[in-house]
Design a protein with these regions (language model features):
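Conserved pre-motif I regulatory segment
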Residues: 2-40
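Short, solvent-exposed amphipathic alpha-helical segments in soluble enzyme
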Residues: 88, 279-283, 449-453
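Short, conserved phosphate/pyrophosphate- and ester-handling motifs at nucleotide-, phospho-/glycolipid
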Residues: 22, 76, 268, 426
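ASCE P-loop NTPase helicase motor core
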Residues: 27, 31, 36, 40-224
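Short coil/loop residues immediately preceding or within conserved phosphate-binding loops
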Residues: 39, 323, 416
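Conserved helicase motor core of P-loop NTPases
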Residues: 6, 25-29, 37, 152-157, ...
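C-terminal accessory regions
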Residues: 337-475
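Conserved SAM-binding loop
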Residues: 18, 72, 264
């Protein structure tokens, strides 16, 4: 099919006259599809309010209308769910698509790409890391390397990476490698790229997007010497919440849009802990440590519990990912062992079609300031559980018993009413509360600007800025 047909059909699927930036992206996409080179790829970069999501959906619908195969991927379960809702096509996480487990309890190797003539579209690509993770059980430990290798090992398969360079880059990286044409061309790929910068007219009426654009411009111009001033006047979708009104306002959000559509975003685990305790005690009136209906976040990848379920249910996810949100259905059998606290939980996974799973969880991580068990705590748990198998003669057999031990594999969890921005990234909620903590002009860094932009753009309907200082308010 000629490139011109793709252009016409995508514009029709869009349903309105594209902006100049969108038209350029459509033209570039058509050229990318027309290129006969097996190693062509495309980067579609765009910030909040520029119509990137709308354009991505139009591209997906056009490809399907032309009976072309598409696969939609995202780095997290929540991001995949958002991508699927915006495009009308199921999406999955990158890990679930490209890796498969060699054996029970074993590492995950790169799966063969059995698809042919398929376009792989990956949303929220700014989150894709390529720093080799020590002790990673996934492929090479470099997710971007593995993704590129997987896609291009399939006959006539291609990759489109979609994302926002203004968002936080992956932890430990200066920029998002998946959105860098220089980095991607290093794989020997021919890179087509397009940037959406022009904010759509309807987006300019949104206080969230107006202010996000002001913040983004501070990133791109590299001249930020003062903290951004936020405009509240004239925008009903962005409000300042004094601390003494927070409990009542949060309770209103929970009743209006529900817990699944409300999120508090903070700058540290310590601050998130304070919020989580306060919300449970003063908004939800929960006294027990864990109760039915509690929202939790998994804070360390876990393979053990899904393996147990796989034997009887082949639709079970391959693993539970760090960052997955779950809802408690039942709580049973609290006990103390090895110097730690454990509990049996029946969990529901809203981002995975409400999949249900029974696990043993470790509750010591609920209130700690560390992201998960500290190295010292992990070593203590290892030593204590290993001591139980002291009578087992050989070291390999002791390790085998350890890997099959439910307490050593207990799920590490935190409350999920308030999270850090890295944990919120990839997700969107109707009501988002942002607490940046104490800030001065001297504390201004590029990382803070990326943080603030990412936090602002998690909200789809209303943004609440908690204890926002007058010095950062536009007069």
């Amino acid at each position: 099919m000629y490139a011109i047909n793709y252009k016409t059909l995508i514009v029709q699927a869009l349903g309105f006259k594209p902006t100049a930036d969108q038209q350029h992206a459509i033209d570039t996409f058509a050229e990318f599809l027309a290129d006969r080179d097996d190693h062509a790829t495309m980067l579609l970069r765009g910030s909040a309010g520029t119509g990137k999501t709308t354009l991505s959906g139009a591209i997906v619908r056009t490809m399907l209308a032309l009976k072309q195969r598409v696969v939609l991927l995202a780095p997290t379960g929540r991001a995949a769910k958002v991508f699927a809702l915006n495009s009308g096509v199921p999406a999955s996480t990158i890990h679930r698509r490209i890796y498969r487990q060699q054996s029970l309890g074993g590492a995950f190797s790169l799966a063969p790409n059995m698809m042919t003539d398929t376009l792989f579209l990956v949303d929220e690509s700014s989150m894709i890391a390529n720093e080799g993770l020590r002790e990673s059980v996934f492929g090479t430990g470099c997710l971007l390397d593995d993704l590129v290798q997987f896609v291009y090992s399939g006959r006539n398969c291609r990759l489109v990476l979609i994302g926002d360079k203004a968002q936080l880059p992956p932890v430990g990286e200066e920029e998002s490698p998946a959105l860098s044409s220089a980095f991607i061309s290093g794989y020997g790929l021919t890179v087509y790229e397009s940037d959406l910068r022009e904010v759509l007219r309807q987006s300019q009426q949104s206080g969230i997007l107006y202010n996000a654009t002001v913040i983004r411009q501070m990133i791109t111009h590299d001249e930020a010497i003062a903290l951004p001033k936020i405009r509240f006047s004239g925008f009903p979708d962005i409000v300042c919440v004094p601390g003494d009104e927070l409990i009542e306002t949060l309770a209103t959000s929970y009743s209006q849009v529900g817990m699944d559509e409300t999120m508090v975003v903070t700058r540290s685990n310590k601050r998130a802990n304070i919020y989580n305790q306060g919300i449970r005690n003063q908004v939800l009136w929960r006294e027990e440590e864990l109760t039915s209906g509690d929202w939790l976040m998994v804070v360390k990848n876990s393979y053990y519990w899904t393996e147990q379920k796989k034997a009887e249910d082949t639709s079970a996810p391959a693993f539970i990912a760090n960052g997955d949100r779950v809802v408690i259905q039942r709580v049973r059998n609290r006990r103390d062992l090895y110097g730690f606290h454990f509990v049996d939980l029946w969990l529901q996974f809203p981002d995975y079609d409400n999949y249900e799973l029974q696990v043993t969880a470790l509750t010591d991580t609920l209130a700690t300031e560390a992201p998960a068990l500290t190295r010292e705590q992990s070593q203590q748990l290892f030593d204590e559980v290993m001591a139980d198998y002291a009578d087992v003669r050989t070291k390999p057999e002791r390790y085998k018993r350890l890997k099959a031990d439910p307490y050593y594999n207990a799920l590490q969890i935190k409350y999920a009413y308030a999270v850090t921005c890295h944990k919120a990234q990839g997700g969107q909620w109707a009501h988002v509360y942002v607490d940046q903590g104490y800030m001065t002009d001297e504390m201004l860094t590029p990382d803070y600007i990326h943080w603030l932009y990412t936090a602002f753009t998690r909200a789809t309907e209303k943004l609440f800025l908690v204890n926002w200082p007058k010095t950062q308010t536009e007069e």
